[in-house]
């Protein structure tokens, strides 16, 4: 799966970083050959207000695939709780014809997302992250959502509907709530995507994910394995280790090891 390959490359780079002296600051760039960066590459742009004082979350959705209001309301709350944006966090919804209602690859998400983008992720004093809600499924149909670069996520509602078990517990709406927060958590760099946590909370078998099933960053959240939660109480919160990581990144006590170049 391409997403795991990309995360694997990112983690390999992080393993090599001790050879570099000190931490990279908010302007530090590594020569990773993706001009739109990697998930987590714009985490400080969200956590800090020195450059970007406001944030826009651009929701581009296929007709009939508008996200649940509970999902976007919850995402706004989670971002406001961790991101320093004194001029506010706004959501912009745009119905979009992606001309693809079948199978999506990570490159499709990047390329068609780029075509649909209203503005650059880093424009003036506003940081913009983009979330696609397309028709169709990811090329690995067990994947419910994917973060493909520093500012872009796709959520696959068709696969979410398929993941809802016959008892509707958890419901498709509850699954979407969790998957959306989970994927944006990857844009925030969780878990260990662009830093090394002082806490041992990364799942060794699922890099970039939490080993705590009460965290929204738990590894099963972004895949059809989520149906194994037989009640309707899916995690939608970052746990204390996740929040401590974000706080440490924000105050500089945790080194940020990679930040993105300016995306296209």
Question: Model segments located where?
Answer:
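Conserved small/polar residues in nucleotide/adenosyl-binding loops
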Residues: 258-264
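Bacterial N-terminal signal peptides that target proteins for export
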Residues: 2-9
